[in-house]
Regions:
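Short beta-strand His + acidic residue motifs that chelate non-heme Fe in jelly-roll/DSBH
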Residues: 50, 69-71, 92-95, 101-106, ...
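Double-stranded beta-helix
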Residues: 3, 7, 11, 77, ...
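Glycine- and acidic-residue-biased ligand/ion/polar-headgroup-sensing regions
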Residues: 55-75
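A short, N-terminal "cap"/entry segment at the start of jelly-roll beta-barrel domains
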Residues: 1-35, 81-86
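Conserved short histidine dyad/triad with adjacent acidic residue
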Residues: 39-55
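Short glycine/proline-enriched turns and hinge-like loops at secondary-structure junctions
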Residues: 52-54, 61-62, 105-108
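Short acidic-glycine-tyrosine-enriched beta hairpin
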Residues: 73-98
Length: 130
């Protein structure tokens, strides 16, 4: 399957129309697949809690747009913050298993390619930092 500007535009348009201001386009056939590969179109204002994945690392590659990726310690203090932008040298990040993180979308039409181990596991209450 070709990943082109038209596909990115389609997923971004769907994100703008979604109340959560984001939309996935999955390349895996099932939520039980051992590899979860997807486009994630994100709009400014989307809310992603500080969270972690205890059993998998997670990789983001920014295809279009700009976002801030922030990392936290167990007390909720920021330990690192990076800007990922498709027009700069910082275009991706591999987030280690168990690392608290969140992101802030800085421009409209931002799209990332996201990969993590499957099967899909919704976040548990103890995977969200309060």
């Amino acid at each position: 399957m070709l990943i082109d500007k038209d596909l990115l535009d389609k997923v971004s348009s769907a994100a703008k129309g979604n109340e959560r201001l984001r939309m996935n386009y999955n390349f895996h056939d099932s939520l039980d697949a051992p590899s979860q590969r997807l486009l994630n179109a994100l709009e400014p204002g989307t809310k992603i809690p500080i969270h972690r994945h205890k059993t998998t690392s997670e990789t983001y590659i920014i295809l279009r747009g700009k976002m801030r990726l922030s990392f936290y310690d167990n007390d909720g203090k920021i330990i690192e913050s990076v800007i990922l932008c498709s027009d700069t040298e910082n275009i991706g990040y591999n987030i280690p298993e168990g690392q608290w993180h969140t992101l802030e979308v800085l421009v409209s039409n931002t799209v990332i390619f996201e990969v993590k181990d499957g099967p899909y596991q919704p976040l548990n209450e103890d995977d969200i930092l309060k």
